[in-house]
């Protein structure tokens, strides 16, 4: 797990054009525009905090919150790509001597999942999980610019070490629960409304091959979708590779329902989104977005560029459908830089179905192989 970011180089929001080639031979056009960068003159706006943006959540007002894994903060954006003048610092686990490293996050609209500071408690409106084993929550009445630790499993060592990669919320038997992917222990952890861990035997798939850990997680229509990535020898980070991945579906009580997708086009999958009638699965491993039937898991298509090559965003993380758009986040494999992009899709040609449009935002980078582990170059 990489937690040192000595060479933060660039973050960028951009717009371009691509074409999606589907199995039905329909033609879909994508375009995107430069919104944000930490390099002056590259985009419309500059944001030095946008480094390895990972999970996203949206507030009731429509503001997008982004977990910046590389800088240990959450940055906020309007849906037109402009920044909101609030940066929330994500706390670290007690053993973490570096900056925070948030990954997944969720918006909490319940009165539960309270955090406490100076003897005062309030519900965490946003909940963050981090690679250092911490879970934190933010409520502006307690601290406007800092999230507050709710769970610190960063002190766990050995087989019980916690490395959190994703989170989602759900309701089971009338109670609210937080579900967190612990990549190191190969378990999905469940927390009750008071941040107490429960259901230790839930989310078990007896047929899952050894060496895979839960990676991304989403709640779709009261079913918990979990992606799995191949683990490195220390079980800290994913190992990319063609076919390295699975997607399972559980109920909100942690009971296994079905294996949805096995291997195939998966490559360290993390991002999940229901878009139109399909399930978009974003691969961190190769940066591709694949579309599947959300019920059967049947492969439908890979999003393609105009020249017939797969549309790729290096280090692709989250997928967030919002309004008429799907927002993407991505960061470098070295986690030292990132950029964002807005992507708009318009259906064209004789296979056009209605007049629907999808606008998308993507955050991605292409690393310089010679600088791996130090810094990355951005290639538009």
For every predicted segment, state its role.
Residues 5, 339, 360-363:
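Aromatic (phenylalanine/tyrosine) cluster motif
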Residues 2-12:
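Bacterial N-terminal signal peptides that target proteins for export
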Residues 11-21:
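Bacterial N-terminal signal peptides
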Residues 27-350, 370:
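Sequence/structural signature of beta-propeller domains
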Residues 360, 375-376:
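Cysteine-centered motifs
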Residues 10, 353-356, 380:
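Serine residues within intrinsically disordered or low-complexity segments
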Residues 25-28, 360:
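Short, threonine-centered small-residue motifs that mark membrane-proximal processing/anchoring sites
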């Amino acid at each position: 797990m990489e937690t040192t970011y000595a060479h933060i180089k660039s973050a960028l929001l951009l717009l371009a054009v691509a074409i999606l080639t589907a199995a039905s031979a329909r033609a879909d056009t994508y375009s995107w525009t430069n919104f944000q960068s930490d390099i002056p003159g590259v985009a419309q706006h500059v944001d030095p905090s946008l480094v390895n943006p990972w999970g996203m959540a949206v507030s009731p007002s429509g503001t997008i919150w982004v977990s910046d894994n590389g800088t240990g903060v959450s940055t906020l954006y309007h849906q037109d790509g402009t920044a909101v003048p609030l940066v929330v610092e994500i706390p670290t686990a007690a053993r973490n001597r570096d900056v925070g490293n948030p990954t997944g996050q969720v918006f909490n609209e319940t009165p539960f999942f309270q955090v406490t500071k100076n003897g005062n408690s309030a519900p965490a409106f946003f909940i963050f999980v981090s690679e250092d084993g911490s879970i934190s929550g933010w409520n502006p009445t307690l601290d406007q610019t800092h999230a507050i630790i709710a769970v610190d499993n960063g002190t766990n060592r050995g087989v019980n070490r916690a490395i959190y990669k994703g989170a989602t919320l759900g309701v089971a038997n009338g109670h609210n629960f937080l579900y967190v992917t612990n990549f190191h222990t190969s378990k999905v952890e469940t927390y009750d409304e008071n941040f107490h861990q429960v259901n230790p035997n839930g989310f078990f798939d007896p047929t899952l091959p050894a060496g895979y850990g839960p990676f991304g997680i989403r709640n779709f229509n009261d079913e918990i979708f979990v992606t799995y990535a191949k683990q490195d020898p220390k079980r800290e980070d994913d190992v990319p590779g063609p076919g390295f991945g699975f997607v399972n579906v559980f109920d909100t009580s942690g009971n296994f329902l079905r294996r949805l997708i096995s291997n195939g086009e998966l490559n360290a999958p993390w991002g999940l989104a229901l878009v139109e009638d399909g399930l978009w699965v974003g691969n961190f491993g190769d940066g591709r977005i694949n579309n599947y039937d959300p019920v059967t898991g049947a492969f439908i298509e890979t999003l393609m560029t105009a020249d017939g090559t797969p549309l790729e965003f290096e280090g692709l993380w989250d997928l967030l459908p919002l309004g008429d758009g799907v927002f993407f986040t991505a960061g470098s494999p070295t986690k030292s830089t990132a950029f964002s992009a807005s992507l708009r899709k318009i259906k064209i040609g004789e296979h056009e179905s209605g007049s629907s449009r999808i606008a998308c935002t993507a955050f991605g980078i292409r690393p310089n192989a010679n600088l791996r582990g130090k810094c990355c170059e951005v290639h538009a």
